[in-house]
Swiss-Prot record:
Chief localisation class: secreted
Glycosites: N76, N90
Name listed for the protein in its UniProt record: Interleukin-5
Alphabetical GO biological process terms: immune response; interleukin-5-mediated signaling pathway; positive regulation of DNA-templated transcription; positive regulation of immunoglobulin production; positive regulation of podosome assembly
Gene name in the database record: IL5
Quaternary assembly: Homodimer; disulfide-linked. Interacts with IL5RA. Interacts with CSF2RB.
Domain of life according to the entry: Eukaryota
Coiled coil feature spans: none
Swiss-Prot/TrEMBL keywords: Cytokine, Disulfide bond, Glycoprotein, Growth factor, Secreted, Signal
SUPFAM superfamilies, per the entry: 4-helical cytokines
Amino acid sequence: MRMLLNLSLLALGAAYVSAFAVENPMNRLVAETLTLLSTHRTWLIGDGNLMIPTPENKNHQLCIKEVFQGIDTLKNQTAHGEAVDKLFQNLSLIKEHIERQKKRCAGERWRVTKFLDYLQVFLGVINTEWTPES
Protein backbone atom coordinates (compact mmCIF):
# COMPACT_ATOMS: atom_id res chain seq x y z
CA MET A 1 0.00 0.00 0.00
CA ARG A 2 2.81 2.36 0.95
CA MET A 3 4.61 1.56 -2.33
CA LEU A 4 1.43 2.37 -4.27
CA LEU A 5 1.15 5.72 -2.49
CA ASN A 6 4.80 6.53 -3.25
CA LEU A 7 4.35 5.61 -6.91
CA SER A 8 1.21 7.74 -7.10
CA LEU A 9 3.02 10.73 -5.62
CA LEU A 10 5.94 10.20 -7.98
CA ALA A 11 3.59 10.07 -10.98
CA LEU A 12 1.81 13.21 -9.78
CA GLY A 13 5.13 15.01 -9.41
CA ALA A 14 6.23 13.92 -12.89
CA ALA A 15 2.96 15.17 -14.37
CA TYR A 16 3.41 18.49 -12.58
CA VAL A 17 6.97 18.91 -13.89
CA SER A 18 6.02 17.97 -17.44
CA ALA A 19 3.13 20.45 -17.37
CA PHE A 20 5.60 23.24 -16.67
CA ALA A 21 7.93 21.98 -19.40
CA VAL A 22 5.12 22.28 -21.95
CA GLU A 23 4.16 25.81 -20.85
CA ASN A 24 2.85 27.97 -23.65
CA PRO A 25 5.72 29.98 -25.20
CA MET A 26 3.42 33.01 -25.52
CA ASN A 27 2.77 32.92 -21.77
CA ARG A 28 6.53 32.95 -21.15
CA LEU A 29 6.97 35.83 -23.62
CA VAL A 30 4.21 37.87 -21.96
CA ALA A 31 5.64 37.18 -18.49
CA GLU A 32 9.11 38.27 -19.63
CA THR A 33 7.64 41.39 -21.25
CA LEU A 34 5.76 42.32 -18.08
CA THR A 35 9.00 41.96 -16.11
CA LEU A 36 10.88 44.14 -18.61
CA LEU A 37 8.09 46.72 -18.55
CA SER A 38 8.16 46.83 -14.77
CA THR A 39 11.96 47.02 -14.67
CA HIS A 40 12.25 49.81 -17.26
CA ARG A 41 9.13 51.81 -16.42
CA THR A 42 11.08 54.83 -15.14
CA TRP A 43 13.24 54.81 -18.28
CA LEU A 44 10.12 54.68 -20.48
CA ILE A 45 8.44 57.53 -18.59
CA GLY A 46 11.46 59.78 -19.21
CA ASP A 47 10.59 63.36 -18.29
CA GLY A 48 6.88 62.46 -18.24
CA ASN A 49 5.89 64.90 -21.00
CA LEU A 50 5.08 62.36 -23.73
CA MET A 51 1.34 62.24 -24.38
CA ILE A 52 -0.04 58.95 -25.75
CA PRO A 53 -3.75 58.44 -26.51
CA THR A 54 -4.95 55.88 -23.98
CA PRO A 55 -8.28 54.05 -24.32
CA GLU A 56 -10.81 54.82 -21.60
CA ASN A 57 -12.49 51.47 -22.21
CA LYS A 58 -11.35 48.96 -19.59
CA ASN A 59 -12.07 46.08 -21.99
CA HIS A 60 -8.63 46.00 -23.55
CA GLN A 61 -9.73 43.24 -25.92
CA LEU A 62 -11.69 45.90 -27.79
CA CYS A 63 -8.77 48.35 -28.01
CA ILE A 64 -5.96 46.25 -29.49
CA LYS A 65 -5.35 48.65 -32.37
CA GLU A 66 -5.12 51.65 -30.03
CA VAL A 67 -2.81 49.82 -27.63
CA PHE A 68 -0.37 48.95 -30.41
CA GLN A 69 -0.51 52.51 -31.80
CA GLY A 70 0.48 53.69 -28.32
CA ILE A 71 3.33 51.17 -28.25
CA ASP A 72 4.57 52.49 -31.61
CA THR A 73 4.46 56.07 -30.30
CA LEU A 74 6.35 55.05 -27.18
CA LYS A 75 8.92 53.15 -29.25
CA ASN A 76 9.49 56.11 -31.57
CA GLN A 77 9.85 58.61 -28.72
CA THR A 78 11.99 56.59 -26.30
CA ALA A 79 15.78 56.50 -26.18
CA HIS A 80 16.82 52.93 -26.86
CA GLY A 81 19.15 50.66 -24.99
CA GLU A 82 19.65 46.91 -25.19
CA ALA A 83 17.08 46.11 -22.49
CA VAL A 84 14.44 48.50 -23.86
CA ASP A 85 15.03 47.10 -27.36
CA LYS A 86 14.26 43.63 -25.96
CA LEU A 87 11.00 44.97 -24.51
CA PHE A 88 9.92 46.40 -27.88
CA GLN A 89 11.04 43.23 -29.66
CA ASN A 90 8.82 41.18 -27.32
CA LEU A 91 5.89 43.56 -27.85
CA SER A 92 6.34 43.18 -31.60
CA LEU A 93 6.25 39.38 -31.28
CA ILE A 94 3.08 39.62 -29.18
CA LYS A 95 1.50 41.87 -31.82
CA GLU A 96 2.39 39.36 -34.57
CA HIS A 97 0.82 36.57 -32.50
CA ILE A 98 -2.38 38.58 -32.02
CA GLU A 99 -2.52 39.38 -35.75
CA ARG A 100 -2.21 35.67 -36.57
CA GLN A 101 -5.00 34.88 -34.10
CA LYS A 102 -7.24 37.58 -35.60
CA LYS A 103 -6.97 35.87 -38.99
CA ARG A 104 -8.72 32.90 -37.39
CA CYS A 105 -11.83 35.06 -36.87
CA ALA A 106 -12.94 34.58 -40.46
CA GLY A 107 -14.90 31.39 -40.80
CA GLU A 108 -16.98 29.50 -43.24
CA ARG A 109 -20.74 29.59 -43.34
CA TRP A 110 -22.46 27.07 -41.11
CA ARG A 111 -26.03 26.48 -40.09
CA VAL A 112 -27.54 28.93 -37.65
CA THR A 113 -27.29 26.47 -34.75
CA LYS A 114 -23.48 26.49 -34.91
CA PHE A 115 -23.44 30.31 -34.95
CA LEU A 116 -25.83 30.44 -32.00
CA ASP A 117 -23.59 28.03 -30.07
CA TYR A 118 -20.61 30.29 -30.81
CA LEU A 119 -22.61 33.39 -29.82
CA GLN A 120 -23.57 31.79 -26.52
CA VAL A 121 -19.91 31.06 -25.68
CA PHE A 122 -18.91 34.57 -26.81
CA LEU A 123 -21.48 36.19 -24.52
CA GLY A 124 -20.36 33.94 -21.67
CA VAL A 125 -16.80 35.23 -22.12
CA ILE A 126 -18.03 38.82 -22.08
CA ASN A 127 -20.03 38.08 -18.96
CA THR A 128 -17.18 36.46 -17.03
CA GLU A 129 -13.86 37.74 -18.39
CA TRP A 130 -14.40 41.34 -19.44
CA THR A 131 -14.10 44.09 -16.87
CA PRO A 132 -17.48 45.81 -16.47
CA GLU A 133 -17.62 49.56 -17.08
CA SER A 134 -19.01 51.68 -14.31
